[in-house]
Amino acid sequence: MSRGIIIIGSGFAARQLVKNIRKQDAHVPLTLIAADSMDEYNKPDLSHVISQSQRADDLTRQLAGEFAEQFNLRLFPHTWVADIDADAHVVKSQDKQWQYDKLVLATGATAFVPPITGRELMLTLNSQQEYRACETQLRDAQRVLIIGGGLIGSELAMDFCRAGKTVTLMDNAASLLASLMPPEVSSRLQHHLTDMGVHLLLKSQLQKLEKTEAGIRATLVSQHSIEVDAVIAATGLRPETALARRAGVAVNRGVCVDSYLQTSHPDIYAIGDCAEINGQVLPFLQPIQLSAMYLAKNLLGGNAPLKLPAMLVKVKTPELPLHLAGETQRRDLSWHITAESDGMIAKGMSGEGQLRAFVVSEDRMKEAFALLKTLSV
C-alpha cells in the first residue's frame, strides 16, 4: 500500500485500531486526522470527574506527539475533514488533501441535546474538550439538573451527589435505565440513588430553560419548575454520519458496515461509536476492541468476519455497580430476581427456559462470567 491507511478520528476506536495494525505491520503508512488535539484520555473517566475533583487536563494520559512517535504515525490534529472523494481515494480539508488506499471512519458520536427553548444553556460531557469548556461552571454549581436516566445520566447523578451537590435526575420514562432493562431490575439502583439524596423526576419532560438572576429556571411540560445552577444533557448519543453521507456511503442510524467493518464503498471502513454493524450500534468498549482486532487484519489483506461473543456492559455507579449482558431490553422475558444485602442477581428467561439476559450488582458481580458462559445468544 503505497498511499497507506487514513483514519479519521482519534478516540478509543482509532487508537485501538492503530495498535492492532502496528502489531502486524510496522511500516504501512498510517495517517490520523481529527478535529481535536489528539491527546489520549479515558472517556469513561468523565463519569467521575466531579467527585474526584479532576480538571480536564488531569484526564490526559498521553500527548499526541508521543503517540505518533511510539506507533510511527502522521498526525493532523485540529483539522476538520470537509469532504471525501471516494472514487479518487482522496480526503480533503479546507487547505489540504491526502490520498489513501484504505480509509477508516472513526468519527464517534455526538451528544444529543433536546430541541427545546433554551437548549443553548445545556451542557454535555461527551469528551474531554466538552468538559474543559464547562468544568468551572460544574465545579461551582450546587444545584444540578441531569436530563436523561440512562447509563450516563445515572452515572453522573451518583457522581455529582457524591460530590455533595443537590442533584435532580429527569427522564420521560417511568424508571431508570428504561431502554436497557425492566423497572423491577433497575429499581435497586433507583432506590439507592433516592437514598443518596438524588431527586428523581420520572415520567417528566422538559419544556424550556431560562436564564435567571439566581441561575437557570427549568420548566417542565407539567408547568412545574425548578431553579438550578447547571443543566446537563445525557439523553443519548447520535453516531456522526455527516462525512460518510457526503462521501456517498450508506448510512442508517450509524455508518452501515458488514461483518468485515466495510461500508458500501469497498475501500472505506467504519469502527466505533459511528459504526452500525449489521444493523446494530454498539457504543461499548469490548465490541470496539474486538472490532479493531478484526479490522486491522482486513485492512492488511485478511478476510476475517467480526464475531462478537456475549459481552458484559458495566454501569459505573460505584456505590451500586451493575454488570449486564444479553438481551436485557427484551420485554417478553420472564425475570427471576434474587436480591439480598450483598447484591442482586436478575435472570431473564425465555419461554423455552433459556437464559437470554442477566443483571448482577455489587458482590454478586463475581458470578457474571459464569452466567455469561450459560447465556443463549
From Swiss-Prot:
Please give the name of this protein.
Nitric oxide reductase FlRd-NAD(+) reductase
Q: Name one Pfam family in it.
A: Rbx_binding
E.C. designation(s) = 1.18.1.-
Report the GO molecular function annotations.
Answer: oxidoreductase activity, acting on iron-sulfur proteins as donors, NAD or NADP as acceptor
Query: What family does this belong to?
Result: Belongs to the FAD-dependent oxidoreductase family.
Q: Which GO terms describe its cellular component?
A: cytoplasm
The UniProt gene name for this protein comes to norW
By its UniProt entry, which InterPro entries does this protein fall under?
Answer: FAD-bd_OxRdtase, FAD/NAD-bd_sf, FAD/NAD-binding_dom, NO_rdtase_NorW, Rbx-bd
Pathway the protein contributes to: Nitrogen metabolism; nitric oxide reduction
Keyword terms, alphabetized = Cytoplasm, FAD, Flavoprotein, NAD, Oxidoreductase
> In which domain of life is the source organism classified?
Bacteria
Catalysed reaction, written as an equation: 2 reduced [nitric oxide reductase rubredoxin domain] + NAD(+) + H(+) = 2 oxidized [nitric oxide reductase rubredoxin domain] + NADH
The record lists the lineage as:
Bacteria, Pseudomonadati, Pseudomonadota, Gammaproteobacteria, Enterobacterales
List the subcellular locations.
Answer: Cytoplasm
Which cofactors, by name?
FAD
- Function recorded in the entry: One of at least two accessory proteins for anaerobic nitric oxide (NO) reductase. Reduces the rubredoxin moiety of NO reductase.
By its UniProt entry, which Gene3D superfamilies does this protein fall under? Answer: 3.30.390.120, FAD/NAD(P)-binding domain
Query: What NCBIfam families does the record point to?
Result: PRK04965.1
